[in-house]
């Protein structure tokens, strides 16, 4: 045997083969969440991501209006009477853990309506909690301008702070006046029913919804939430011109996300005029069919269809 060459180890070879075969069988057949997660990642490999149905043009938005567009998942771009707000930005093809050579996590089912390079300079970024589908470090590092940031309690350590003019964490029922070059805005954190851990062990991280007020006009952002009577209590902070509520990832219920019907009911309890369904048509995070959340939302509002502000990624709404 040549010097330095290791002898062939038949037992090690067989053991490695059996281990790989077992892992493959487990991934293919197991009903566990982890096996389904890896099966989904394998299916995504090489899959094209379709373009969003609509593409907003913020350069044409009028500053005296209240205008917003759904960019995908929970990400909303708002022109709040001249002040640009971006909520829970996820603007890249995949979310999850950054491994250096790539990101391990779900791939988008639909492209964002706008990429970071397409955004106007942002004045304020809101982050409701630290879950990867709401707090995406790559997206937060790519926001144009030098915005202020308001985040849920104990989440700002995940933010690339050098890109931001100021960073403020809020606990439930705390509020702050955020001053920007385009004027001020009041942000209040509200309690919702969810959880904040990013990697399961950091259960101390906060989570919240937000109420945003400017010149007497108010918007309610529900973040992620399960069904809760809290939104009836939040009514006292209204009236709200629109409630931005999650309607997807409810099957199974253990993820603590409300159903579309529950989301509509909570927005009604809060007294919101318009309903904006979020958290669907973007990532496969649960078991319900792709279009089921919006179909159930439309059915829940069948008697008041004018209250449904939008249904497609990229759609733009103007509230004069």
Sequence positions of predicted segments:
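N-terminal export signals
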Residues: 2-6, 12-33
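Cap/insert and terminal regions of metallo-dependent hydrolase folds
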Residues: 4, 8-12, 16, 148, ...
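C-terminal segment of N-terminal export signals and the immediately downstream linker at the start
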Residues: 6-7, 28-61, 67-69
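Metallo-beta-lactamase
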Residues: 42-63, 151-217, 295-319
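Pre-active-site segment of Zn-dependent metallo-hydrolases
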Residues: 53-60, 80-126, 137-142, 196-198, ...
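Catalytic core of the metallo-beta-lactamase
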Residues: 71-79, 178-241, 254, 261
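Active-site metal-binding loops of divalent metal-dependent hydrolases
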Residues: 89-91, 130, 192-193, 223-225, ...
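Active-site HxH/HxHxD metal-binding segment of metal-dependent hydrolases
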Residues: 93-100, 113-178, 190-191
